[in-house]
Amino acid sequence: SYPNKQPYGPSGFWM
C-alpha cells in the first residue's frame, strides 16, 4: 500500500 510501516508479505510491499 503506502510506505507507512515496514515491508510486509513475500513481495516486500509496504503496508
UniProtKB/Swiss-Prot annotation:
GO CC, alphabetical: extracellular region
EC identifiers of the protein: 3.2.1.4
Record field: pH dependence: Optimum pH is 5.0.
Catalysed reactions listed for this entry: Endohydrolysis of (1->4)-beta-D-glucosidic linkages in cellulose, lichenin and cereal beta-D-glucans
Entry's Gene Ontology BP terms: cellulose catabolic process
One term of GO molecular function: cellulase activity
Function: Has endoglucanase activity on carboxymethylcellulose (CMC).
Protein name, per record: Endoglucanase 1
